[in-house]
Amino acid sequence: MDPILEEFERAISGLTYTSPTIDYVSDLTGQPVSSGIDAAYWARHLRNPVRFTDATATLHEKGISTFIEIGPDGVLSGLIRETLDREQDLVAVPMLRRDRPEPHTAVTAAAHAHTHGTPVTWTTLHGQATTIDLPTYAF
């Protein structure tokens, strides 16, 4: 990575960077970030080790127990479960799985999160559905 760092930083230095508007934990530092994200940050991110375990632990310490992996397969979900296995109510699920239909795996991930207390806006996934009244049963 070293040979391209300066060129990379120059290439992205013209972009506009703003402070995060939601809580953000960096896997460059493993700590929350509120400012300082600029071209130099992303160049360091490209070069330095990923501190994924530290970032995950920081999120968990802040009360996060549901993790949804956005990526091509479930590698990091397994790492989260392995790292934070002491937490029984932990959910770590991948949004996508290799060689499986995306709609199915995405809805499965949302369902896992929902059953563990994470609010899910189902109409975003399924669109507006027509509802009908069903007969009641005496059992």
PLM regions: where:
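Short glycine/threonine-rich loop-to-helix capping motif typified by GTGT followed
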Residues: 1-6, 82-83
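Alpha-helical context
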Residues: 4, 35, 89-90
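Flexible, low-complexity segments
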Residues: 11-18, 23-25, 41-139
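Reverse-transcriptase-like RNA-dependent polymerase core
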Residues: 27-29
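Short, acidic Gly/Pro/Ser/Thr-rich loop/turn segments
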Residues: 31-32, 75
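Gly-rich Lys/Arg/Thr-decorated short loops/hinges at beta-loop-alpha junctions or inter-strand turns
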Residues: 33-41
